[in-house]
Amino acid sequence: MKLKSLALLLMTIAMPAMAEQVSVNSKGISLILDVENGKPAQYLYFGSKLNAADLQNLTVATNGRMDAYPAYGLNTPAEAALAMRHSDGNLSTVLVATGSDVKQEANATVTTIHLKDPVYNIKVDLKYRAYKDVDMIEAWTEISNGEKGTVTLTTFASAMLPIRRGDVWMSHLSGTWAAEAQLSHEKLQPGEFVIRNNDGVRNSHTDHAEVMFSLNGKGQENTGAVIGAALAYSGNYKLKTVTDDTEYHYFFAGINEQNSEYHLKKGETFKTPALVLTYSNEGLSGASRNFHKWGRKYVLAHGDQERDILLNSWEGVYFDINQKGMDQMMADIHSMGGELFVMDDGWFGKKYPRKKDNTALGDWVVDTEKLPDGIEGLLRDAKKNGVKFGIWIEPEMTNTKSELYEKHPDWVIKAPKRDAVVGRGGTQLVLDLGNPKVQDFVFGVVDDLLTKYPEIAYIKWDANMAIMNHGSQYLSAADQSHLYIAYHQGFAKVIDRIRAKYKDVVIQCCASGGARANWGCLRGFDEFWVSDNTDALQRIYMQYGTSYFFPAIAMASH
């Protein structure tokens, strides 16, 4: 009986390749598409869940472009979700439906709409995961190359959504260092509204990859129809809303393709990040609650567990780490009812001790002058003081003044034939996570710490530099445009390896403040640092904005 139940969970239900409605339903919302063999798949509806009678009355709108995944080439004035250069140089692509299927998961259904180019051996699968107990739908795309040679993807959105014109307003977050996540509301006007990121490593200091569309006027907290959308990606992104002479706005979201055209080799499949969609008739707060429920249950590590009250050493001592001082801080936080102490930057480096921010990143060995009893002594003191112990690392980075850089200068991201632009301390550089050897090294930083010191309960993972230099010493000259995408593919592989081995450790993603507040990172982390600004009054506004898309449990605080 158990075997039979398992088989049913994994069963794929094939649907006939003919004109039909494909319904993607969560607990209370529906996404309906028209899928007819040999024609483009088209949107019919997105909103509150429909019953059978409602479905019978749906028709494809004629006053807008309803293609579910519009391709470039035969309607060049229109915005496209997909554009490519075929192996013979042809820039035109046509996508028509060949059928659909549904796969049952434990708490969701995954609907796939199969598309292909009738002339070229290009297949595109539109994927929709609808959760059974929360009103969220994840939409992503998988593009497969069956041509004889390499094709070049120049535009590859995760998804497109048409929104009927009217009094439609967009709510989104923007800001800067120490003033992140400021909420703005703007009415959609004719033209293009673009939110994009080019940082390379982090992506939410200035703008966020999450938006809400209020369909009945300026967004209200508890009333009105609202569409929420979040691109679950840790790297460069682009959200674009196009309003032209039709009756619709067209919302596109995906990886920012600027300087990132992707060469898809024969037999390969490219998978986009997911665009997470929700809908609510209970205003902005209703959409927020959907994000919170989904994130806590299906994305965040330990999303159902209370976070410990912690003290971090940074604001107290900065780089002035020492054994006695750490012991005293542990005693102090315990006396105030705290449960966790986190030792921040400044604890490492042998040949180049970390006395300030220009040395030792990559040399993850204890500075025994500062900490003569090592991490063992810190763990002993934590136990004595009745608190857990956590530690700071920045494993994606190095300094030119480090043993790591001396051994592996070929591991850094650097433009060929040019001096590298350096970051913090005048020496910081970014390691190339597209390189499998670098991935092994970064995994090893965490693995070594947690293998030697399994009592470590918490890791603060920082990232204090953007990719300033476009150049991978690992990728071929022809594939240099893969740099940003390869970096985040490598980042995801590392986080997956860490989580597979260390499920219980709590990990915070920090990035010069709130630069990694995104659902792409949170798939492997417990929380993110909201801002380096810890002023209590100013934090209210930043956490208020952040709360539109992220639950309070995801906002780290110390």
Give the predicted meaning of each segment.
Residues 28, 141-143, 318, 349, ...:
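Active-site and adjacent substrate-binding regions of carbohydrate-active enzymes
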Residues 14-16:
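N-terminal signal peptide c-region/cleavage motif recognized by signal peptidases
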Residues 2-9:
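Sec-dependent signal peptide recognition
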Residues 399, 405-440, 444, 485-558:
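Glycan-recognition surfaces
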Residues 302-444, 453, 457-458:
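Aromatic-lined carbohydrate-binding/catalytic grooves of carbohydrate-active enzymes
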Residues 68-96, 213-240, 279-300, 338-345, ...:
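Glycine-rich, aromatic-flanked loop segments that form ligand/cofactor-binding clefts
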Residues 22, 84, 91-97, 262-281:
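Short Pro-Gly-centered flexible turn/kink motifs
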Residues 20-32, 39-242, 258:
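Polysaccharide-binding surfaces and accessory modules of carbohydrate-active proteins
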